[in-house]
Design a protein with these regions (language model features):
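N-terminal pro-sequences and low-complexity stem/linker regions of secreted or lumenal proteins
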Residues: 22-513, 518-598, 602-628
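Fungal secretory targeting signals
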Residues: 1-24
Length: 628
């Protein structure tokens, strides 16, 4: 392992940034794609308190058959019937030590039991009492800054409801071979659902599973066949996180063969820094960082933040800044809880549901699983937008297929199952190729992680300096819903197909100012209302309800005051009396709202709304304010 002691000032004035004279305005402008996957954090665990995302202020929160919101997780503790989300650093004595706190289990069984057939009521009873713990901005300022300066996805999920290895295998191959999708397990490997690295199969009642190594096709092999340059930047202590090591073709590759040289070398993060700085990165890169910097509990978010900042720094300040996309993701939740039900396929969908390999009894979905943090850093994702399309690790592969096609190359990973291919986002809508921004923001400027005798020691220091104060007391019986679901106030602009889970403002810009559709509390009519600069007014705040599943583009639109929109321009008291509207997204333009009569809704700067045959595009803003 090599210490990365270099530290450059992150901020760089726009005046010193290279700005091209002509914007290409398409996916073909991307010449370099960098994939960087960290470890074991859930979306709510990191971003539940962030404004403008599907977090603790979710107006469409899942409820059980009794009407109890998912926030109320049942417990077996005598002090409290339920546990609400809680801030890990609430007690000042535990504030620093909570950086190296540990959550629950990331295993297949525990996380499926937390899912509990869609009830999402087993995080505490079936996983860990710490599963409902979370951080806020003060603990992870870099992560908040990346989300707010570039783009964060709040509907991005782990590929499988399970641990690290299968999620990372899916990250480069798009399958885990459930239902023998790509071949018989004893011949080709899988179904891969646990952190298993013994060169044999496991069996339950004679049925094989976790057959290892894996022998199906991976994305780097397809890139190699198309003469697309690629490399895996893997540090020496990260073998278990490098999915290339799970696959037989890489293990069998001659030491001087492309799969071994590019996929299994120990040319880690220092080489990435060098090549990003001098402009010699391959077209596609994978970063597998040092394990102590991976954010895998108890390794600290702060240590991982340094590596995130350094990666962004060398890309955005290097010669490839204007044509590079960096995706930062997390493999799985690490046993930290998330409140959004996984958007799994219909029961019985081919390759997506299976008998639990460990018991051959329960019939469970493979995934997609619970939400994890996901960012896109590029000139086309600047500005702090929220990407709302359902996505998972296969989405990164689907993006690469689209990107390769834009470069004139034919890359298609056939192992991606039909349902995933047709339902998971390819991430292209995350980008606004017509309006790139080449200015570079300032991040938190995290210090280099503590290092001694050839090893990172920040985790050890955290544990020793805060001995007895890393796992805060669980606040059983000492919570209020208002405190538990506290979130920052503010707003973010949405991109991508609209989904539930946010208070939204439908706004349009006119030369007279910004106007939004709205409703006065005392009126039954829709109006066009001038908005505040922070979109804080209740009168133009709405909740949308998808008709169908998380992939539907049909919605009921409800005023924050409770009534539902109709095509007549009036509001109805119930859904039964309301109309269903089609809401569609077009990249670089925005959202259209189409009535059942086929007309498009629009605003005007004169107080009235319009219904016309011409598309009228809205900017949809996700807002979080504590008057909700």
């Amino acid at each position: 392992m090599v210490a990365l002691s270099m530290k450059l000032p992150f901020a760089l004035a726009t005046a010193f940034t290279a700005i091209p004279l002509v914007f290409g305005g398409s996916l073909s402008d991307v010449k370099h794609v960098v994939y960087f996957m960290q470890e074991n954090r859930a979306f709510d665990h990191y971003f539940g308190t962030m404004s403008g995302v599907r977090g603790f202020k979710d107006p469409n929160v899942h409820v059980d058959e009794k009407g109890t919101p998912v926030w109320y997780q049942p417990t077996t503790n005598s002090e409290a019937e339920y546990l609400l989300p809680f801030y890990l650093g609430a007690n000042p004595a535990y504030k620093n030590g909570s950086q190296c706190a540990v959550g629950g289990s990331n295993d297949w069984t525990e996380n499926h039991n937390a899912w509990n057939y869609g009830k999402i009521n087993g995080w505490i009873t079936n996983n860990s009492q710490y599963a409902w713990g979370h951080y806020d901005r003060s603990d992870i300022p870099t992560h908040f800054a990346v989300a707010e300066e570039w783009s964060v996805a709040d509907m991005y999920a782990e590929f499988v409801i399970g641990p690290t290895a299968p999620n990372r295998a899916s990250w480069i191959s798009g399958t885990l071979n459930f239902d023998s999708q790509v071949g018989a397990p004893e011949e080709i490997g899988g179904p891969y659902m646990e952190n298993w690295s013994t060169h044999e199969c496991e069996y339950t009642d004679g049925v094989p599973f976790n057959c290892y190594p894996l022998k199906w096709m991976t994305m780097p092999e397809l890139l190699e066949a198309q003469n697309i340059s690629w490399f895996v930047y893997r540090d020496s202590d990260s073998t278990n996180d490098d999915p290339m090591y799970y696959f037989q073709n890489y293990l069998d590759s001659p030491s001087d063969g492309p799969l071994a040289v590019k996929g299994l070398s120990y040319e880690g993060f220092p080489l990435f820094i060098e090549q990003a700085s001098n402009g010699t990165l391959p077209e596609v890169s994978w970063i597998i960082g040092s394990f102590p910097l991976s954010e895998h509990p108890p390794h600290t978010p702060t240590s991982g933040a340094w590596m995130i900042e350094k990666t962004i720094e060398v890309i955005t300040q290097g010669p490839l800044a204007n044509d590079t996309v960096l995706f930062i993701s997390y493999d799985e939740t690490g046993g930290w809880g998330d409140h959004v039900p996984p958007f799994v396929s219909p029961n019985g969908t081919a390759y997506e549901w299976a008998l639990n390999p460990l018991t051959q009894k329960e019939y469970w979905p493979v995934g997609p699983g619970f939400r994890v943090p996901f960012f896109a850093v590029s000139p086309w994702t600047r500005g702090g937008s929220v990407f709302s399309e359902p996505s998972d690790h296969s989405s990164q592969l689907l993006f690469l297929e689209e990107w390769a096609a834009a470069q004139g190359k034919d890359v298609k990973l056939d192992a991606i199952a039909p349902w995933r291919r047709s339902h998971m986002s390819n991430l292209v809508n995350m980008f606004d190729f017509e309006h790139p921004r080449f200015d570079i923001p300032t991040l938190a400027n995290v210090s280099f992680p503590a290092w001694s005798d050839g090893a990172y020691i920040a985790t050890t220091i955290c544990q020793e300096e805060n001995k007895g104060y890393t796992q805060p007391p669980i606040p059983y019986g000492n919570q209020t819903l208002q405190d538990a679901l506290w979130a920052e106030e503010g707003y973010k602009h949405l991109r991508g197909a609209l989904t539930e889970g946010r208070y939204v403002v439908f706004s349009q810009k006119w030369k007279q100012g910004t106007y939004a559709i709205g409703k006065y509390k005392s009126s039954d009519n829709i109006h066009s209302l001038s908005t505040a600069s922070n979109f804080s007014g209740e009168r133009y705040r709405f909740i949308v309800y998808q008709v169908g599943d998380a992939f539907s583009k049909e919605f009921y639109i409800q005023s924050v005051f409770g009534e539902y929109l109709t095509h007549s321009g009036r509001f109805a008291s119930t859904k039964a009396k309301a109309d269903i509207f089609s809401i569609n997204y077009t990249a670089s333009k925005g959202y259209t709202i189409k009535s059942p009569a086929g007309q498009y809704l629009g605003t005007s700067p004169y107080g009235g709304i319009t219904w016309t045959d011409q598309k009228s595009y809205f900017d949809v803003v996700s807002v979080t304010y504590n008057d909700e």
